[in-house]
Amino acid sequence: MKSLIQPLMRAAGVCVITDGAAGNERQALALAQAMRLTPTVQRVALRAPWRWIGPAQTRGVRFAMPRAQWRALSRPWPALAIGCGRHAAVVTRALRELSKGATYAVQILDPRIDPAHFDLVIAPRHDGLAAPNVIQTMGSLHPIDDARLAAARAAFPLFAKLEQPRTVLLVGGPRRGLELDTAWMTRLIETIDRWHERDGGSVLISTSRRTPAEWRERLRGAFRHGCTCFWGGDADGANPYAGYLAYADRIIVTPDSVNMLSEACAT
């Protein structure tokens, strides 16, 4: 039976649905890739009122997005729809209902409605979501494995020449429910600077879209003993994130990103 699943899904179609947020899309694609499926990706920007109501109401959902996008999602119904995030949950629930079960709907992250509206819900354990069709994970889904780390080492060979220990700092930023201020960042910089002075080695820093501009500028020239590599965006060249993970001796992650924490643990 298992040998039939992949051919059937390839024939009938697999789609990944997100709001376009990188963290959400990365999780949904990681699941599809782990199943050795090649999905189409639909990034939905829901119109009002669906973007306010969320998955609690799916009536008229075809009007929540451009007509061409709804047609791409529903003609034919995909065999498998993988959604991640609240806006995606509107669509994955609707596909399951309107297709009369022809679409197997998988929702990643707590949809904040009864999980019974989906075939499968995958949510981190800290969300506290429990139901017969819920799989709890320790962190977030991600694509990091030995093969990807080996590929990253091959793609960033210069990192192998950096002095050890290689300390990687992955920086996000403040978000709702988590206060990270300038004083907190100052303490973090001072701690890493003391480690660097004591142990030597290299410091490699990466920031994200959520990182305040003030933090980014401070981090760029923060360490008395020098920062070996700093990446703050496309202006700094190719994103070295995968290479950082592959070569790190120790990784420090700001606590705002479950995705980055999970991927760091996978190394």
Sequence positions of predicted segments:
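Short, structured helix-loop element that forms part of the nucleotide-activated donor/catalytic region
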Residues: 210-223
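Active-site and donor-binding regions of nucleotide-sugar-utilizing enzymes
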Residues: 16-17, 21-136, 142
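A nucleotide-sugar donor-handling region in carbohydrate enzymes
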Residues: 115-181
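Catalytic binding pocket for nucleotide-activated donors in carbohydrate/polymer assembly enzymes
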Residues: 259-267
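Conserved catalytic-core segment of nucleotide-activated headgroup transferases in glycan assembly
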Residues: 165, 174-207
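Donor nucleotide-activated moiety binding/catalytic core segment of transferases
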Residues: 220-260
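Alpha-helix C-terminal capping/helix-to-coil transition sites in glycosyltransferase folds
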Residues: 76-77, 117, 243-247, 266
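Extreme N-terminal starter segment of soluble prokaryotic enzymes
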Residues: 9-15
